[in-house]
Amino acid sequence: MKETIAQHLLDIEAVTLRPNDPFTWSSGIKSPIYCDNRLTMGYPHIRQSIAEGFEQLIRSHFPEVTVVAGTATAGIPHAAWVSDRLQAPMVYVRSKSKGHGKQNQIEGKLSSKDRVVIIEDLISTGGSVIQAADALREAGADVLGVVAIFTYGLEKGQDQLEAANLPSYVLTDYPTLLDVAIRRGDISEEELQKLQKWRENPSSQSWMNE
């Protein structure tokens, strides 16, 4: 499954590898990779593979789930498709409460008896997932963990998820993506070294001199 999903993401350029012309993230970090998993919505066969993968992960690791929660906005469509496959209720979680109406941060029906799995499109530093988990826990729900399409596997993200008591499982990951990309000829050996070096210390720009 990991290789298949990685191939899908590369095929539609949901993940773009550009070590010789790096992207600048909103945090200011220079990155050789950019991920926009929202593009998967436009490909029915790919989003079906993702939904099937999520269903397998949830049934395997979180069989006691009663509610599926999508993170706004990218996790919402995938949460809808997965909750349909599981025949489970769905909610979604905003990054912050609305400034009008009932000022809800969580949309949908949730009770203190619910056991929730969060659906995310990408795990980077883990901040958005933890924010969603905090909101769900404040509402009284038992947050079992998170499943995501892809992760950079950054040490900071892994540490923060562990500290927040959030087990996480992904459909594919950074090493798998690089393996697929080098085999397909999408990147050279020199570019592979830069990509590997970046993940060791994303806040440093030393990888650009590899």
Curated annotation (Swiss-Prot):
Its EC number is 2.4.2.10. One of its GO terms (biological process) is pyrimidine nucleobase biosynthetic process. Keywords: Glycosyltransferase, Magnesium, Pyrimidine biosynthesis, Transferase. GO terms for molecular function: magnesium ion binding; orotate phosphoribosyltransferase activity. Pathway: Pyrimidine metabolism; UMP biosynthesis via de novo pathway; UMP from orotate: step 1/2. Orotate binds at S124. This is Orotate phosphoribosyltransferase. The gene is pyrE.
